[in-house]
Amino acid sequence: MGQKVHPYGFRLGISKDWKARWINEKNYKEYLLEDLKIRDYIKKTYHSAGVSDIFIERPEPGKVSITIKCARPGVIIGRKGSEVKKLRAGLERLINRKFQLNIEEVKTPETDALLVAEDIASRIEKRASYKRAMKRAIFTAMRKGAKGIKIMVSGRLNGAEIARTEWYLEGRLPLQTLKSDIDYGYTTALTKMGIIGVRVWIYKGDVAQKKATEA
């Protein structure tokens, strides 16, 4: 039986970077649980900000650096920084450590796999046509520069009695090529008929080509 490898883990250390950048054998369990609490708190509290990624660094004991990548940074910052103050207070209560907070904007959320998946899931929850939502996401991503995109939804689609899987693919998607920059996102849509899973793969080109273009 064939097994699928996670696209991010497959490229980790080659074309993808670690989301938690620290090493500590003595306090590993404590730090790991702390990381999970931080991610969970930010995701739940600022879901409307379109949080794509959270990177956590621990340059030295007792210090934490948190970088939030989101589509709508204004939601997290708030008017005159009011929301950031609330976020800082919430994190201080949660981890009781000194920390540095950085907020980065996702320039093209249309080509961010997790944000695309969350947008489709949100539309499905609002009873929109899943096919229309998938086609719209594919069209927008390709127009914004994606080289290829695949979207897969599974569950009781349109309230069907039997769960099934449907997917659309546009462009190229070289999953087995390590140099290919592939973004992957997964989320779920909660409907009256049950949970519908949404998976998105977006191919953004080869890493070597992107570095040469940036240089």
UniProtKB/Swiss-Prot annotation:
Pfam families xrefs: KH_2 (PF07650), Ribosomal_S3_C (PF00189)
Signal peptide feature range: none
An annotated GO BP: translation
Every KH type-2 domain range: 38-107
GO MF annotation: an example: rRNA binding
SMART domains, A to Z: KH (SM00322)
Keywords: Ribonucleoprotein, Ribosomal protein, RNA-binding, rRNA-binding
Record-linked SUPFAM superfamilies: Prokaryotic type KH domain (KH-domain type II), Ribosomal protein S3 C-terminal domain
GO CC field: cytosolic small ribosomal subunit
PROSITE patterns: KH_TYPE_2, RIBOSOMAL_S3
Described purpose of this protein according to its UniProt entry: Binds the lower part of the 30S subunit head. Binds mRNA in the 70S ribosome, positioning it for translation.
Protein family (similarity comment): Belongs to the universal ribosomal protein uS3 family.
NCBIfam families cross-referenced by the UniProt entry: rpsC_bact
HAMAP family (alphabetical): Ribosomal_uS3_B
Subunit structure comment from the entry: Part of the 30S ribosomal subunit. Forms a tight complex with proteins S10 and S14.
Record's protein name: Small ribosomal subunit protein uS3
Organism (species): Kosmotoga olearia (strain ATCC BAA-1733 / DSM 21960 / TBF 19.5.1)
Taxonomic path: Bacteria, Thermotogati, Thermotogota, Thermotogae, Kosmotogales
